[in-house]
């Protein structure tokens, strides 16, 4: 079992093209998980406070939503993963009477984790510096099981009223059903 650690401070991100006078900004959040649950290369997945650059992993479906929904409906160009990895975001963090700007680099796209991920080392450092009076409680859990088609898992989660993300329990049931059919 792994825990998601939430950011306990305010975060905003911006990007734009100064030459064109375009600037986009939004409030956002970060979460982190232990490295062993990250499903992309860890080669660029480290935080160095002195470098002032935050590695970020976003869900692949965010890029797909942009490319096949927003961009397509507005005749905008699609963005590749390679191009997105070249974009640097301006990240503003606020809390504990501090306001600091860092750069954010997208270093990967997750198929499994539906959140805006930063390294655990960054999250621990940032929560300590921007929200020292708060204790970061896990916001969600990652549960890895040997056999996701085991109905006891589904039953247990339903009895406890636990929510699962992405209907993974239903996918397990479907796999079980297909195995049952192919065995007949």
Language model features with spans:
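Pocket-edge structural micro-motifs
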Residues: 32, 60, 166
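Short, basic, helix/turn surface patches
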Residues: 29-33, 184
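Domain-start "cap" segments at the beginnings of catalytic or binding domains
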Residues: 23-24, 34-41
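Peri-transmembrane interface segments
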Residues: 147-184
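Basic-flanked hydrophobic alpha-helices used for secretion and membrane insertion
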Residues: 1, 9-13, 38-49, 54-162
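Hydrophobic, regular-secondary-structure patches
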Residues: 1-30
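Short amphipathic alpha-helical patches
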Residues: 14-17, 86, 177-181
């Amino acid at each position: 079992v792994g825990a998601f650690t939430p950011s306990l401070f305010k975060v905003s991100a911006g990007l734009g093209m100064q030459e064109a006078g375009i600037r986009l900004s939004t409030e956002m959040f970060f979460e982190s998980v232990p490295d062993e649950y990250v499903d992309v290369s860890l080669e660029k997945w480290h935080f160095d406070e002195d470098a002032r650059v935050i590695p970020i992993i976003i869900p692949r479906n965010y890029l797909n939503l942009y490319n096949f929904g927003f961009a397509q409906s507005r005749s905008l160009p699609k963005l590749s993963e390679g191009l997105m990895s070249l974009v640097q975001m301006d990240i503003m963090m606020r809390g504990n009477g501090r306001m600091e700007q860092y750069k954010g680099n997208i270093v990967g796209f997750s198929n499994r984790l539906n959140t805006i991920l930063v390294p655990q080392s960054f999250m621990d450092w940032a929560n300590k510096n921007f929200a020292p009076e708060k204790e970061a409680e896990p916001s969600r859990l990652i549960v890895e099981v040997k056999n996701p088609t085991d109905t006891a898992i589904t039953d247990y989660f339903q009895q406890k009223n636990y929510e699962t993300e992405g209907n993974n329990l239903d996918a397990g049931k479907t796999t079980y059903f297909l195995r049952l059919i192919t065995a007949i």
